[in-house]
Structures are given as C-alpha cells and as structure tokens.
Amino acid sequence: MPARLGLSAAFRSLSIRTNQLPQQQSIAAAVQARTLITDSTTSSRLPPRVQIQQQQQQRTQPYSTETTPPPNSNNGDLAGIEGQPPVEVTPENAAALSQLSEIAYGVKAADVAIEGHKYGLPTLPLPSELHHKYRYSEVVNHATKLLMKDGKLSKAQRDMAMILNYLRSSPPPKLNPSRPLIPGHPPASHLPLNPVEYLTVAIDSVAPLIKMRGYKGLAGGGRSLEVPQPIPARQRRSTAFKWILDVVNKKPSKGSGRTMFAHRVAEEIVAVVEGRSSVWDKRMLIHKLGTANRANLNSPALQLKGKRF
C-alpha cells in the first residue's frame, strides 16, 4: 500500500524557481549609479564633511581630457554593453554629479563650507541714487516741495509729473540773446529730450546771485543799511522758483481742472527759457540794487559792529 502524502509534505516537495531579471538599464541610470557608488572620493568610511572637502580639492585640480580621463570617469561602466558609444564626462557633468552626492549626504547649498555668493556683492560705497529717498533729481525734489500745499505731497508730485511731461512734448524753445541762459547749457533742440535738465536750466538761469540784507540803524537817523550778500545754490533755486509761482498765481486761470495749474507753471518755465517772463525783471532789479549798494560793504558802521563779508 503506498504511503500517504499530506499537504505539508506536498508543499515541501515543491521547488520554487525565480527567474533573474534582465540586466538592461538606461545609460544615465548606470552612469549615475556607478558615480554615486564606486566613486573613489566618496568613501562611506569617511564623514560627509571630509568627503565634500576631498571632492572640492579634486575639482580644483587641473586635468586634461585628452591624455587622462577626468575624475569620476564612467567610461568603463558601459564597456560590457555592445553597440553603445563610450560616455565622456565633462567637468560640468562631474561637478553636477558631485553636487548630487553632496545633496544625498544632506549638505545644503547655503552651507558655510561652500564659498561665494549667488548674485555677488555690490561695490561700496553705494551711490546716492540707489537710496529710495533720493532717487529723484535734487532740483525736481526741491521744486516738488515748493509746489506742495497743505501737506499734499502726492498732488504736488502729480503736478510735477505733468510739468515734466509738458516740457518733454513741447517744441524746442526760441532763445533770446539779450537774456542769455546759464553758461554750459545744452542746445535748444536738446532741451525737450531731457525735461529734468530743461527745468534745471530755467531755474538756474533766472536765479539771483545775491540778496539784499538791511541792518537797522546803521545808516543813521534810524534808517537801515542795505548790504548785498551772496546766497547758496539751494536758496538761489528756491527764490527763483518762488518768483515763477508768484507770476503763475497772478495770471488769470484758463479753465478749471487739476491739470491747468501744472500747464500754467510749465508755460511759464518755457517763457523763462525764451526770455519772455517777467521773472527776469526781478532778477535784474536785485542785481542793480546790489551794484548800487556795494559801497556799503566798507561802511565804518559795519566794521564797528564786527560784520565782515
């Protein structure tokens, strides 16, 4: 009688066979795997920081791609695969693979060990134009503050933008030889191309060079002694632009709207450059008074008071 076979004996008698998968992998996967595993510079026995330093030293060493292969060369990885061309690893690819290995070890790009900056540092000292408070021209900023009323700076800035736009779109001015502009000014045809320089030339040309100061009681009989004094550039520009605003406010309005005031100021600036504005008369009057009273600079009363000019 044959011996009985139980289920356990039947399972033990089975033989399990497994077929090995074909070793066909992509070239990129083989190169990356061989680089990360068999790289001589990344040994698992060393700490990650030491491995990274060794990789950086090897990348800085010069080598020739013609005579000897570069480090981390993977030409032998695909030697057993028939029909595949040899893989040449450039220095850029080697650096990229080393960065991948550093990321695999947990080293970040912003680590202290990696020198340099991503975008570079600017040269010091920084120019004043890069400051957000001084990004505009000095003359434009000064004239905007003089245009401001009741602390409404945004309205003054809008008016200044309209003034510059009017100067930019206006035709070239016709200069008057009897009232010359400031020395070194650009030609009349170039002024509309740069409205900021247009405004600067108009203000500096009509700005007075001196001011009259009165000293009470020094002229005798309770009369004040008028003495001419030079003034700095900022005060000269402030006086000239205030004269322009006074002339604009005295002229009749041509209509209502928030753009009319800016247009009248721009028209007066063009009139100043062309020599048609009455601001030139104020400048000539101040200079005539200074010429007439220049003898008061040597007055004995001023010398006794200790005033020197």
Swiss-Prot record:
Keyword Metal-binding appears in the UniProt entry: no
Top-level lineage group: Eukaryota
Subunit-level organization: Component of the mitochondrial small ribosomal subunit (mt-SSU). Mature N.crassa 74S mitochondrial ribosomes consist of a small (37S) and a large (54S) subunit. The 37S small subunit contains a 16S ribosomal RNA (16S mt-rRNA) and 32 different proteins. The 54S large subunit contains a 23S rRNA (23S mt-rRNA) and 42 different proteins.
Annotated source species: Neurospora crassa (strain ATCC 24698 / 74-OR23-1A / CBS 708.71 / DSM 1257 / FGSC 987)
The UniProt record lists the keyword Ribosomal protein: yes
Annotated GO biological process: ribosomal small subunit assembly; translation
Keywords in alphabetical order: Mitochondrion, Ribonucleoprotein, Ribosomal protein
Family: Belongs to the universal ribosomal protein uS7 family.
Full protein name: Small ribosomal subunit protein uS7m
GO cellular component: mitochondrial small ribosomal subunit; ribosome
SUPFAM superfamilies: Ribosomal protein S7 (SSF47973)
Biased composition annotated in UniProt, kind: Low complexity: 51-61
Protein task: Component of the mitochondrial ribosome (mitoribosome), a dedicated translation machinery responsible for the synthesis of mitochondrial genome-encoded proteins, including at least some of the essential transmembrane subunits of the mitochondrial respiratory chain. The mitoribosomes are attached to the mitochondrial inner membrane and translation products are cotranslationally integrated into the membrane.
Pfam families: Ribosomal_S7 (PF00177)
Location of region: Disordered: 39-86
Gene that this sequence comes from: rsm7
Compartments where located: Mitochondrion
GO molecular function, one term: structural constituent of ribosome
Main location: mitochondrion
